[in-house]
């Protein structure tokens, strides 16, 4: 639910109900989650954003924002179009907060093409407890990203992130994670080539993860997108090596209200226990907009 007081601001309250997930060794499906048995409804997003002059936007969140939620663009066109959560650059989740807590962010358009974004998230539990507060929460993260957005051939960005969630990485050591990442998209009109690479340093080791993809816009149908991307995902606890995933998808707009996206996904989770983790998946997503 979006509402506005001035026409330039936004108050968003997003409710979500979900049960189970899919592709959990690879981050699940995009925008999926588990709110418990019987499709319990929870507040997934609750934030307010407003402009400060002509070049600055401020966002204050009670819950729901972390990682790439604070940036103007994630650069790669297959983020959001793909069905798997890995379609979004995975370093944003791996380097962000372990949960979507309270936080604040700023977006500053330095010029018409250069934008710098910064955001801070205090993960639950703690952020929602007045006795603890957002600056004393157990898990905290912050991000800064400089983006070049052109409306033309080249879009690119460099991001730095820091969090207190080293325990999620292979080895399970408590401590911090520092992330350095680059993203790029080359737009040839209706054809694009894009990808990202991220080096993440945690307590006890480091990790390099990446994806790359190609795609066609308006293939056979106006407003459609066909794409294939794949790469090496972050190596968390329980993985012997970095998981691999490849997805092919075709986003089809049936009308102004309905978009259908079928996808074929191949993943190799590389579990430490040696179980069968090399699998093909099929998925289809329906998106209704009103």
Regions found by a protein language model. Give the residues of each.
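Outer membrane beta-barrel
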Residues: 1-125, 147-151, 211-235
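Flexible loop/turn segments at secondary-structure boundaries
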Residues: 20-22, 67-68, 125-126, 165-167, ...
